[in-house]
Structures are given as structure tokens and as C-alpha cells.
A protein has these predicted regions:
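Hydrophobic alpha-helical segments within soluble ligand-binding/sensing domains
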Residues: 39-64, 76-77, 104-108, 156-159, ...
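Second-shell loop/turn segments in exported
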Residues: 35-39, 68-72, 95-99, 120-122
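Hydrophobic alpha-helical
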Residues: 1-17, 82, 95-96, 101-161
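Short, solvent-exposed amphipathic alpha-helices that sit
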Residues: 47-51, 74-92, 106, 110, ...
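Structural detector of well-ordered beta-strand residues that form the stable sheet scaffold
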Residues: 24, 65, 95, 125, ...
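Hinge/cleft segment of the Venus flytrap/periplasmic-binding protein
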Residues: 85-86, 175-221
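Flexible loop/hinge segments that line or gate small-molecule binding clefts
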Residues: 6-46, 57, 63, 154-165, ...
């Protein structure tokens, strides 16, 4: 399962536990980890760290907008990794934050409003690629002339294409095929009565214009 609400899924997990049904969580953790057998996730915190470090190499100072999704642990961790990395650097300022629920349709109007309220935006850190795309569309619709660094997390085909077009600055790569394969392996081992790792964390890398040519633009990793 891939929970939309990391706390709200508790009743379903309890029902599965009661019937001794193994539960494998993929992509984002649940709050009640004792109710699941295996959690397979990207290193979401590190994804945020990588975006922040790249930004700091490109900008000596910045006014930053954050696009979040507080109901998912993965989204929270990505933003936390970013904010922790810049915390001791006063030259990087978070000037606004909006929960977009990870959706392009919510990101676009919220960023349009933020652009109207803030004239000097340097960086937009998005919890995933769809919200980054919404941010880019908002900047375009408002005719925002200043170059803005826009980061996402996913490594989606569309995100990589936008990087090749110099529209998106970077995206921290997820490996959904690896996560899926790990989930199937864990399921077989659980059904066979074998011991399995409680948590599997898959490392991340950052895709930018400097290395995007190393990746397949037509498919996920």
C-alpha cells in the first residue's frame, strides 16, 4: 500500500493486523509502524538535503517558497531535509509556505497567489515533481521575468524533460521500479515465513542539467 494520509490509514491497518494479513508499505511511511510488516521508501530526508545543497551552490542568498504536503511522511521528510540544511544560513530565507497536497492543480493557483504577494522570489522547493510543474506554470502565467530555481522530487520523465529545457533546476530521483521489485520480494519472503528487513531505504541522487543526459527521459528509473 501507498498511504495518502500517514495517520488516517490506521483503522485499515488494524483490520489487516486482526486478520493476520501482511502489510507492505511502499513510497511513504505510516505513522503506526508497528502495524506494518515492511516499509520500503526512498531516503526522502536526503532528497531534501540534496536539493538544498545544490541551491546553495547556485545561489549565495535566496528568498524561498516551500510547497508541502503535511499528511504524508515522505513529503514532510523532504521539506525537513531542505529546511534543516539551510537552517544555520541566514542568507537563505523562507518567505512563504503552502500545502499543495502534492497536486499540480493545487500548486498552480497557490503559487500564482504567492507570486502576487512576493515580488522577489529566488527559489521554489516542491515536495514532488507535479507541484514543481504547477509552480512553473504559475510563474509563466504571471509573466514572472526573474529566473527562479525550481526543485522537485521524483525524477519523473516530465521533470527530466523540463530540466533539459532549462525550466526546472533539479529533481531528486526516486526509483519506483526498485521499490516495486523490493515489495514483491518482501511479499514472497513473508508468505514463505522468512525473516525480512522491517525497513528498506533506497538511496537518492539529484538530477540537474549537468547530469540529466545520463538518464532515460522516457521512463522512470
Amino acid at each position: 500500500m501507498n498511504p495518502v494520509d500517514w495517520k488516517g490509514v490506521k483503522k485499515g491497518l488494524e483490520a489487516a493486523k486482526k486478520k493476520n494479513i501482511p502489510v507492505i508499505v511502499v513510497d511513504t511511511e505510516v505513522y503506526d509502524t508497528d502495524l506494518v510488516d515492511v516499509t520500503i521508501v526512498t531516503d526522502n530526508y536526503q532528497a531534501g538535503v540534496l536539493c538544498a545543497k545544490d541551491m546553495m551552490e547556485r545561489q549565495k542568498e535566496a528568498n524561498i517558497l516551500l510547497l508541502t504536503h503535511d499528511k504524508t511522511k515522505s513529503g514532510r521528510d523532504r521539506i525537513q531535509g531542505f529546511t534543516d540544511t539551510i537552517q544555520s544560513h541566514n542568507e537563505y530565507k523562507i518567505i512563504a509556505m503552502e500545502d499543495t497536497q502534492g497536486q499540480i492543480e493545487r500548486s498552480l493557483p497557490k503559487v500564482e497567489k504567492m507570486v502576487e504577494e512576493h515580488e522577489d522570489i529566488d527559489v521554489i522547493m516542491s515536495l514532488n515533481d507535479p507541484t514543481a510543474m504547477g509552480a512553473l506554470a504559475a510563474l509563466d502565467s504571471k509573466g514572472y521575468k526573474k529566473d527562479v530555481l525550481v526543485y522537485g522530487v521524483d525524477g519523473s520523465p516530465e521533470g527530466k524533460r523540463l530540466i533539459t529545457e532549462s525550466k526546472m533546476t533539479g529533481t531528486a530521483v526516486q526509483y519506483p521500479r526498485k521499490m516495486g521489485a523490493s515489495a514483491i520480494k518482501a511479499a514472497y519472503e513473508l508468505l514463505a515465513g522468512k525473516d525480512v528487513d522491517k525497513t528498506v531505504t533506497i538511496p537518492v541522487k539529484l538530477i540537474t542539467k549537468e547530469n540529466v543526459s545520463e538518464y532515460d527521459l522516457e521512463r522512470w528509473q
